[in-house]
Swiss-Prot record:
Compartment list: Cytoplasm
GO MF, one example: translation initiation factor activity
Pfam families on file: eIF3_N, PCI
InterPro entries the record matches: eIF3e (IPR016650), eIF3e_N (IPR019010), PCI_dom (IPR000717), WH_DNA-bd_sf (IPR036390)
Species, as recorded: Drosophila pseudoobscura pseudoobscura
Highest taxon of the lineage: Eukaryota
Name the record gives this protein: Eukaryotic translation initiation factor 3 subunit E
HAMAP family linked to this entry: eIF3e
């Protein structure tokens, strides 16, 4: 299934350190040649300051067990540079108690005043803290790096030349330390900055494309991520436009989120429209499964695609944890769609559509009825399932209306903002003639 693997293209939009978990994940699969994959990891890790990881990769490639002279020298240089940077920030390193106390850092002005008064803080110390945070990150010491990056965010002005780099670095470090709550906060902060910054159209598109890829890592690991990925990718026009323009392969992750999110079935209609629009640029078993089911009503095709979906998800680092949930919810979607067409269904027919044995299918339906997720009755003698009516709840109708209005409002706001910028530009240009 290498033809459906997105690792290569996803890594193009990720920081070098964020690619390592994806590459290590692939090492446990049989998609690519193991030797070539390890050689690529070694080539990539050589561009960082993670000497121990470099040596470990060399051992896995059956290279020399002893550290080469070049690496010995590099390790000494890394340690020397690290010590020098730590000496430069020594005046604020004494403030580690404040760094650990989040409450005292919420008010930026108060915090800076305290640093200046108690620790003789100067502006040049901020540049040193930034350099140390970046160097610690390059060494793979992500946890310690986050402390200094947080310090920089509190003290720095948003107009500082390094502010955007700090936002990206903080998000990457929190992802790599699996701090998903903080990572989500950093993701939101970075998105707000990108959306409000005075970037050119191309720069904004590039920034959003990178953010989209990084956010997938957060959304599929945070409890609220399944709702947030739908809101951001499907109902924020600027990000939907970035996906359609730069990275239509992200449709895989949006589609997966909708399938496994039973409370957002109202998003299916909008998702299907986008999938159809982008079908000429990107297709995979997950998007094709939804097309088979909701566009063509091809249940046999959906059944076959669901089987392919399992292989795709099993080999995708971003969504592998969703495999069982995806299969369960996809079967439910097949069942619900089939039931809208046929009010009375034989269990054997249903089992065939769901890739299940008849007794497994019957137990599965019984559990659905028992858990109040299905209005139906089973006639065991005839082997039939008789469906009842399933009206859309007022809550679902309200959510659908709100999503629709939200998307339209954001689209109109974007049009007004672009028109305003154009008028301002024309006004400024007119002064050139006087």
């Amino acid at each position: 299934m290498a033809n459906f693997d997105l690792t290569r293209i996803n890594c193009q939009y990720l920081d070098r350190h964020l690619t390592f978990p994806l590459l290590e994940f692939l090492c446990g699969k049989e998609i690519y040649n193991q030797q070539e994959l390890l050689e690529y990891i070694l080539e990539t890790v050589n561009k960082t300051n993670m000497i121990d990881y470099t040596m470990d990769t060399r051992k896995r490639l059956n290279l020399s067990q002893e550290m080469p002279d070049e690496l010995v020298q590099r390790k000494a240089e890394v340690l020397a540079t690290l010590k020098q940077l730590q000496n430069e920030v020594a005046p604020i390193m004494k403030a580690t108690d404040i760094l650990k106390n989040g409450e005292s850092m919420k008010d930026s002005k108060t915090f800076v005043n305290a640093l200046q008064k108690d620790y003789n803080f100067k502006v040049e110390h901020l540049e040193s803290a930034y350099k140390l945070a970046k160097y610690l990150y390059e060494c793979g010491n992500y946890q310690e790096s986050t402390s200094y990056l947080y310090f920089c965010l509190i003290v720095m002005s948003p107009n500082d030349k390094n502010y955007l780099n700090v936002l990206w670095g903080k998000l990457a470090a929190e992802i790599l330390t699996l701090n998903w709550n903080t990572a989500l906060e950093d993701l939101t902060r970075l998105r707000d900055y990108i959306d409000s910054a005075n970037f050119s159209t191309i720069q904004a598109l590039q920034q959003r494309t990178w953010l989209i890829h990084w956010s997938v890592l957060v959304f599929f690991n945070h409890p609220k991520g399944r709702d947030l990925i739908i809101e951001m990718f499907l109902y924020k026009p600027l990000y939907l436009n970035a996906i359609q323009t730069m990275c239509p392969h992200i449709m895989r992750y949006l589609a997966t989120a909708v399938v496994i999110n039973r409370t957002r079935r109202n998003a299916l209609k909008d998702l299907i429209k986008v999938i159809q629009q982008e079908s000429y640029t990107y297709r995979d078993p997950i998007t094709e499964f939804l097309e088979c089911l909701y566009v063509n009503f091809d249940f046999e095709g959906a059944r076959l695609k669901l089987h392919e979906c399992q292989t795709v998800i099993l080999n995708d680092f971003f969504i592998v944890a969703c495999l069982n949930e995806f299969v369960e919810d996809a079967r439910l979607m097949i069942f619900e769609t089939f039931c809208r067409i046929h009010q009375c269904i034989t269990i054997s027919m249903l089992a065939d559509k769901l890739n299940m044995k008849p007794n497994e299918a019957e137990c599965w339906i019984v559990n659905l009825i028992r858990n109040a997720r299905l209005n139906a009755k089973i006639d065991s003698k005839l082997g039939h399932v008789v469906m009842g009516t399933q009206p859309l709840s007022p809550y679902q109708q309200l959510v659908e209306k709100i999503d629709s209005l939200s998307m339209r409002s954001e689209h109109l706001a974007g049009l007004i903002e672009r028109k305003s910028k154009q008028n301002n530009k024309e006004s400024i240009d007119s002064w050139k003639y006087y």
